[in-house]
Amino acid sequence: MITVVKNGRVIDPYNNIDSKLNIVIKDGKILEITPYEISGEKNIDATGLIVCPGFIDIHMHEDMYHNEEDYLDEWIAKSMLNMGVTTCIGGNCGINLTEPLTYLDAVDRLKLPVNIGLMAGHTNIRECVVENSNKYNPIQTDDIKKIMYTAREYLEGGCFGISYGIRYVPGITELELIEVSKACKPENKIINAHVRDDAKNIIWATKEFIKVGMKLDIPIQNSHIGSMGGYGQMKELLRLLDSVK
């Protein structure tokens, strides 16, 4: 079936488009974007509306699967769609609300009206595989290896990368960050983090995390630049991030 979205303001920053245009869609794929009048089997009047690629929310925490009832929180996904978000990335800040492979399996089976990606949360892995772990204390090398192997299993199972909540697990050492992140190296997957500190120490904390990515030559993402943490330091912080892109 041919669907035409008509008379909308089409905004596509990637292709430098901002114009009133008509979009021709067939089987879920765009066939044509044209300024000329055209009709299809189904016509959607977008007069006064913006038509654009779906937004990607790279930082969500709503990756909950209700095992006993076997359902996902579809209302959250629908709320995201209402805001124009079509792809969501969960499992951030080191936290998974559901065991990653269980959640990904549920997404495949039950479906959601948005695309879902998932990070493997370091904090949850640490708590599960390290006996009597204490978030305030460093852990032994053998335990670090256990975390890395489990993270690798999750990455091979479909997770996009590893997330860290360094601020919430202050016992994480540089060695632990580097060794666990090696699981991302084979497929050049990403690591992201809520860094170790904020406010006056935000620059130092960001540099600590950047060092991990540079040492392993893998992509990184700084999950947050807090408004108060960046106050008076934002230009310096953005220059730092730009310098290592």
Q: How should each PLM-predicted stretch be described?
A:
Residues 1-39:
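N-terminal metal-binding scaffold of metallo-dependent hydrolase/deaminase domains
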